[in-house]
Design a protein with these regions (language model features):
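Ankyrin repeat (ANK) tandem alpha-helical domains that serve as protein-protein interaction scaffolds
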Residues: 1-135
Length: 135
């Protein structure tokens, strides 16, 4: 049986839904905000956002956070995965789902992640992801 992480990374949403009990157990074991010292790659929302199929990555992210009640403090892990996979749709969705006062920090964090993954032009990508996709 594939690991739940691999199922998320591959965007196998139907398989993921069949394994809801495992997701619930993972959620139960996640440290509280402030105590969460895991690496980005240790979080299944990173795996979902890192999915090569960007549409499935977005749908998997929505499933984890909206239907399964995945902890909101873990969204940073998903943001890192979305930046690494260049998932503009998911970045746009995340940006539009946060409070206004968090948006400036979010843009800075995305830019930092894109730079760390050697994106040739982070500011153009961010402009596309956050503003062009709205149109």
């Amino acid at each position: 049986m594939k690991s739940i992480w691999k199922v998320c990374e591959n965007g196998e949403l139907d398989e993921l839904k069949k394994r809801r009990n495992e997701i619930d157990q993972i959620i139960e074991d996640i440290p509280n905000d402030g105590d969460d010292m895991r690496e980005d790659e240790d979080d299944i929302s990173f795996a979902a956002a890192y999915c090569k199929d960007h549409d499935m990555g977005l749908e998997t992210f929505k499933y984890l956070y909206e239907e399964c009640g995945y902890p909101r403090h873990c969204v940073h892990y998903a943001m890192v995965g979305a930046a690494a996979s260049r998932n503009a749709k998911l970045i746009n969705y995340m940006y539009n789902d946060i409070d206004e006062h968090e948006k400036e920090n979010f843009i800075g964090d995305i830019e930092d992640e894109l730079v760390m993954t050697d994106h040739p032009n982070p500011s153009v990508f961010i402009e596309y992801a956050l503003f062009e996709l709205k149109k």
